């Protein structure tokens, strides 16, 4: 495997696949990194029992001349190179241009009982199920916000789960207003109608959210607050996710400027997806949640721009802008109810890695001070779960990224050419 | 239907489809993947490699994310719960 690529793409989801394919079609030598064992990302995650959608199969099969580097996690940033860890060891991969297609993760908000086994994200359970997690005959409650809940419920049902209900926190009026807007997006309307048809018979409730999960060693029942009052459902699994948050850790470590439209940053890019760092581009969710269509278009655009074909990228802009408007429509209509920010009580664990409760974090106004005093954010997830939740809860923003981006082996750290000085990451 | 893979989870034999994750194989046996620092049982949360709640020992290697690891024939998985 070469140690240098003209274009290195991080993330093999729809954006990264399009970027790699486009750059390779222009004759560039392209490497496509992903921490997962197979390309596809989250939305096109491989399903062990069902065939992938045609678009996913096409995107993966089109990768002629691209080195797909699966099971490769980025650990740190070097000079025009990334330090990566793979099962066979660690190495440095240099690049001419770097395309960040790092995607998004689910927003997971703490509530009493959320650490019980059997409580997962909504997209989380969908991903687990596609990879063989046993759900056949299991009673599943799906909750949270956004159309992802419907997609997750659909996958669960196809794998034999008994979906007891879908509990959407957005009120019925705004979900209906969103549905009316779909007439401007015929393809989406058809997709939504198909989902609703397949989910016929599954209750879809609005203005409803999970207050608490109960159980001894695993979730057994959940309390759901609805406009009509509180109800308790017995279940085997609870899948609850509140939308998506861009993965920006690598971009932050590279020094790329961030934009804040709310509590969570996304990578700041110009019309041609250039970040504030020369030669580094960001495509898809990393640049703000926009969905699958945006990811594919921006991936292609970044592949064009990174290889010097800006005219081809410009040609995709009108279509991209239109799809970005759909993303804005989604975030407006599925904005989170303020009550979701006060679900956690004093004893609810916020940092699941270090078992830090909400009341232990009282009085802290920055992540670093909280970390030093309570260990909040010092565990293996490096604050991805608790830091993001605390930012959403309005406590304090997450600290900037510092190496290693993910927990790494000592041998990998020993191989870093530029050892991270703590001073450089202490912040001002 | 895809081929089946046989592996061991805490000594119990498990059979799952090829391409399945170690997390899926464990879930056939137990919902306890690891113990938290205060000794509470934990299991996968995010399903996509972010939360590290699913980390287990795979073929002698500790702290492997079960949700990101594909099963292989004869694999030995040990949970920490």
Where are these regions (language model features)?
Chain A
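Residues forming the flavin
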Residues: 2-380, 384-427
């Amino acid at each position: 495997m070469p140690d240098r690529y003209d274009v290195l793409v991080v993330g093999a989801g729809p954006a990264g696949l399009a970027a790699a394919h486009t750059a390779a079609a222009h004759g560039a030598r392209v490497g496509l990194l992903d921490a997962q064992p197979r390309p596809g990302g989250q939305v096109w995650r491989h399903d062990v029992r069902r065939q992938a959608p045609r678009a996913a199969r096409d995107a993966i099969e089109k990768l002629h001349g691209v080195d797909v580097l699966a099971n490769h996690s980025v650990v740190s940033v070097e000079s025009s190179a990334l330090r990566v860890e793979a099962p066979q060891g660690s190495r440095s991969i240099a690049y001419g241009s770097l395309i960040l297609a790092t995607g998004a993760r689910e927003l997971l908000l703490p509530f009493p009982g959320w650490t019980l086994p059997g409580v997962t994200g909504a997209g989380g359970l969908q991903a687990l199920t596609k990879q063989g997690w046993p759900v056949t005959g299991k009673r599943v409650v799906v909750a949270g916000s956004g159309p992802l809940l419907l997609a997750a419920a659909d996958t669960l049902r196809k794998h034999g789960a008994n979906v007891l209900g879908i509990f959407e926190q957005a009120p019925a009026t705004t979900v209906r207003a969103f549905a009316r807007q779909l007439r401007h997006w015929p393809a989406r309307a058809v997709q939504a109608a198909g989902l609703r048809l397949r989910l016929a018979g599954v209750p879809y409730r609005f203005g409803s959210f999970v207050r608490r999960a109960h159980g001894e060693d695993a979730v057994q029942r959940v309390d759901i607050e609805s406009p009509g009052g509180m109800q308790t459902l017995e279940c085997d699994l609870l899948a609850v996710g509140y939308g998506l948050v861009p993965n920006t850790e690598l971009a932050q470590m590279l020094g790329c400027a961030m934009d804040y439209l709310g509590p969570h940053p996304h990578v700041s890019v110009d019309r041609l997806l250039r970040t504030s760092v020369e030669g580094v581009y960001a495509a898809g969710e990393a640049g703000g949640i926009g969905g699958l269509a945006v990811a594919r278009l921006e991936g292609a655009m970044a592949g064009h721009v990174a290889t010097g074909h800006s005219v081809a990228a410009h040609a995709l802009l009108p279509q991209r802008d239109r799809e970005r408007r759909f993303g804005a429509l989604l975030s407006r209509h599925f904005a989170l109810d303020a009550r979701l920010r006060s679900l956690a009580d004093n004893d609810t664990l916020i940092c699941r890695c270090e078992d830090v409760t909400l009341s232990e974090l009282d009085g802290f106004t920055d992540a670093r001070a909280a970390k030093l005093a309570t260990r909040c954010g010092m565990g293996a997830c490096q604050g991805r779960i608790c830091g993001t939740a605390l930012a959403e809860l309005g406590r304090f923003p997450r600290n900037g990224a510092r190496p290693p981006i993910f927990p790494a082996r000592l041998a990998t750290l020993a191989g870093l050419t530029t050892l991270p000085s703590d001073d450089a990451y202490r912040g001002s | 239907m895809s081929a089946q893979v046989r592996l061991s989870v805490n000594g119990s034999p498990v059979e799952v489809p090829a391409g399945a994750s170690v997390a899926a194989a464990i879930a056939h046996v137990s919902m306890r993947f690891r113990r938290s620092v205060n000794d509470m049982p934990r299991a996968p949360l995010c399903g996509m490699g972010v939360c590290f709640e699913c980390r287990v020992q795979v073929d002698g290697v500790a702290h492997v994310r079960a949700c990101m690891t594909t099963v292989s024939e004869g694999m030995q998985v040990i949970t920490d719960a």
